């Protein structure tokens, strides 16, 4: 039988949930020739991942949130959700964030502006390593909406890069 005090100590020292899932949608806006990115992630998982790379707590979604939070978040996602249009790495810019009504999740909004400079996007390659440094059972689900086509992709530690052919 497990000692209840020992169990409590380990639960407090190593809090986690059994599995982690992020949801990302990429929507191609043909009028603006941009890719709009919406991510839904756990605030707890985001804080944990950011603390690995950043020494200070950002206190995301609280009144004590650090002013640098959006820069740190953008940097993290530019490094852990790498999007290549026609095999060229794209950088995305911060649009905003909002806390979900459940107070557990956060929606993050980014954009890749002017991503169709050569006239046609023929392929998208995604490298998604979001929270893989912290979550043993991490899955990252991505929905890509490109013109009339939809693609559902799942990324894990064993499969973190996928390519979609878009050109006809």
Predicted regions and their residues:
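Sec-dependent N-terminal signal peptides
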Residues: 3-13
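N-terminal soluble domains immediately following signal/targeting peptides that reside
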Residues: 16-168
């Amino acid at each position: 039988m497990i000692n209840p005090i020992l169990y409590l100590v380990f639960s407090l020292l190593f809090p986690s949930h059994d599995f982690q899932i992020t949801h990302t949608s990429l929507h191609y806006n043909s009028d603006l020739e941009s890719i709009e990115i919406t991510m839904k992630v756990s605030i707890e998982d985001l804080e944990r991942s950011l603390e690995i790379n950043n020494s200070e707590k950002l206190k995301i979604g609280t009144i004590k949130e650090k002013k640098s939070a959006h820069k740190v978040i953008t940097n993290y996602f530019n490094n852990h959700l790498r999007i290549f249009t026609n095999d060229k790495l794209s950088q995305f810019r911060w649009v905003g964030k909002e806390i979900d009504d459940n107070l557990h999740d956060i929606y993050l909004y980014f954009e890749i502006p002017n991503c169709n400079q050569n006239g046609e996007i023929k392929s998208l390659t995604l490298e998604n390593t979001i929270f893989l440094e912290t979550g043993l059972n991490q899955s990252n689900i991505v929905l890509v909406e490109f013109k009339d086509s939809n693609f559902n992709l799942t990324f894990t530690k064993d499969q973190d890069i996928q390519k979609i052919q878009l050109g006809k």
